[in-house]
UniProtKB/Swiss-Prot annotation:
Enzyme's top EC category: hydrolase
Top-rank lineage group of the source organism: Bacteria
InterPro entries found in the cross-reference section: Ribosomal_Su5_D2-typ_SF, Ribsml_uS5_D2-typ_fold_subgr, RNase_P, RNase_P_CS
Gene Ontology cellular component terms for the protein in this record: ribonuclease P complex
Family named by the database record: Belongs to the RnpA family.
GO biological process, alphabetically ordered: tRNA 5'-leader removal
Stated role: RNaseP catalyzes the removal of the 5'-leader sequence from pre-tRNA to produce the mature 5'-terminus. It can also cleave other RNA substrates such as 4.5S RNA. The protein component plays an auxiliary but essential role in vivo by binding to the 5'-leader sequence and broadening the substrate specificity of the ribozyme.
Protein name, as recorded: Ribonuclease P protein component
Keywords attached to this entry: Endonuclease, Hydrolase, Nuclease, RNA-binding, tRNA processing
HAMAP family noted in UniProt: RNase_P
Gene: rnpA
PANTHER family hit by this protein: RIBONUCLEASE P PROTEIN COMPONENT (PTHR33992:SF1)
Record text on subunit structure and interactions: Consists of a catalytic RNA component (M1 or rnpB) and a protein subunit.
Organism: Klebsiella pneumoniae (strain 342)
């Protein structure tokens, strides 16, 4: 049976992990959210989240966006390529309801899978 846990090993934790992704990213985005990805040598995907207070004013909205993004990643982790991902929330993402945000994330994960197969 496939485990769908979200352990510490699946998270980008240090600034150097984020910098690694920002140096040469593959980009997939919508007007409200961008996912940057870069292949890693670990054999499994990892995720980091950036939701700036400048773009999403209210803490409960930032938390909702992060929670939905983590859940989307957790459910797709076994389908994703071994990449480090940084999810960047842009202005307007707080206006999306949960379903629209989940659908946008699914579309971006599929795009990253295609990009990884193509490289």
């Amino acid at each position: 049976m496939v485990k769908l846990a979200f352990p510490r090993e699946l998270r980008l934790l240090t600034p150097s992990h984020f910098t690694f992704v920002f140096q040469q990213p593959q980009r997939a985005g919508t007007p409200q959210i961008t996912i940057l990805g870069r292949l890693n040598s670990l054999g499994h995907p990892r995720i980091g989240l950036t939701v700036a207070k400048k773009n999403v004013k209210r803490a409960h909205e930032r938390n909702r966006i992060k929670r939905l993004t983590r859940e989307s990643f957790r459910l797709r982790q076994h389908e994703l390529p071994p990449m480090d991902f940084v999810v960047v929330a842009k202005r307007g993402v707080a206006d999306l309801d949960n379903r629209a945000l989940s659908e946008a994330l699914e579309k971006l994960w599929r795009r990253h899978c295609r990009l990884a197969r193509g490289s």
